[in-house]
């Protein structure tokens, strides 16, 4: 999707996503954005566990890699939830919806503003009828 700055009441919610390039022959040209997260996760798995006491793994202290992986997974989960929240909400406009006098482009105005036009037509019709008569 493209940015909607040309719209009258503001910008859409969310950022523009860049497509991820997929190469059939492996990881030749992986995008620089997606690579470090996966690479760091693999490094964290390959790294040997630090020596611990006989009581087993210390539950209070999580390694930095574990924290990073947890945060990344959490962010992905919340973004997936937001997509399927329910019915589509109109968030394109800055204040929820345009002001009433700005809606419909102003062509549905009150009847009062049309009365001079009606009078003008009546006068024109009467004049034409008068000219045809004489």
UniProtKB/Swiss-Prot annotation:
The lineage of its organism: Eukaryota, Metazoa, Chordata, Craniata, Vertebrata. GO terms for cellular component: extracellular space; secretory granule. One of its GO terms (biological process) is regulation of corticosterone secretion. Residues 43-107 are annotated as: Disordered. ACTH and MSH are produced by the pituitary gland. Residues 43-52, 79-104 have a biased composition (Basic and acidic residues). The modification Phosphoserine is found at residue 31. It is found in: Secreted. The modification Valine amide is found at residue 13. This is Pro-opiomelanocortin. Specific enzymatic cleavages at paired basic residues yield the different active peptides. PANTHER family: PRO-OPIOMELANOCORTIN. One of its GO terms (molecular function) is hormone activity. The modification N-acetylserine is found at residue 1. It holds the Pfam family Op_neuropeptide. Belongs to the POMC family. Keywords: Acetylation, Amidation, Cleavage on pair of basic residues, Endorphin, Hormone, Phosphoprotein, Secreted.
């Amino acid at each position: 999707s493209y940015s909607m700055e040309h719209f009258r009441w503001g910008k859409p919610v969310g950022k523009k996503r860049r497509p991820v390039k997929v190469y059939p022959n492996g990881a030749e040209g992986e995008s620089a954005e997606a690579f470090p997260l996966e690479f760091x996760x693999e490094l964290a798995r390959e790294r040997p566990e630090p020596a611990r006491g006989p009581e087993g793994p210390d539950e209070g202290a999580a390694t930095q890699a574990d924290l990073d992986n947890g945060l990344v997974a959490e962010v992905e989960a919340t973004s997936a939830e937001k997509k399927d929240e329910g019915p589509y909400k109109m968030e394109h406009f800055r204040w929820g919806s345009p002001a009433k006098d700005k809606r419909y482009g102003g062509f549905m105005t009150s009847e009062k503003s049309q009365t001079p036009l009606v009078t003008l037509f009546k006068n024109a019709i009467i004049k034409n009828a008068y000219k045809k008569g004489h």
